[in-house]
Amino acid sequence: MKTIILGPPGTGKTTTLLNLVDEFLKDGIRPRQIGYFSFTKKAATEAADRAADKFGLDKENDLPFFRTLHSYAFNQLGMTKEKMMGRDDYKEFGEKCGIPIKTAKFSNEDGTFNSDNEYLTIINTAAVKRMDLLEYYDSRKNILDIERNTLFLLSEELKRFKEEKKLKDFNDLIEDFLLKETSNKFEVLFIDEAQDLSLLQWEMVRKIWSRAEKTYIAGDDDQAIFKWAGADVDHFIALKEE
């Protein structure tokens, strides 16, 4: 069963989800059978804090599945921070390829990628949109400073760099999660801040909810704050018709 909860900011969508969490816990659903995934770490943490305080639970042990999607993939794949692409790795990659990279990192708060290098930004955005890189390039406007062939070569070189160093980025984690044969089965699944999810994240959400008894998805169908990072609000809106 899937329930969609829509509304603009401040209309109580998250409060509705939190009240539902309370109800299911009161009804005897075990905390570890509840998945609560949000776009931002802040929202997931607030949900876990409320449930832990109200029911005397330990966040780490009793509520391990109140997370962001990239954090859940990280956890399920048994990753460590040392295996993740970091600022120094991107800097080394830039030096190796002869391109300037002052800033390049994924946010631990919401999983978005930020870089001062437009090539890396385009490579990342194509990945979260699940688009062929060159097709995405061709669909863009006002990127005259980006050379098509250079973009493709840098993308291939970045793949080799990560393979050689056995490193992953947040997009790789979700793609690897999608390839897993199994995932946790939840009695109840909550998805908050749904309007900000990318198509790549929606594929992960669909895999998780395919094994959930009940699913509640909340978001604002009129606004996506993270469109610049690949948020696919149209996919969210289309859920109402399914």
Provide a role label for each language-model segment.
Residues 1-7, 15-16, 33, 105-190, ...:
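Accessory N-terminal region flanking or inserted into the helicase ATPase core
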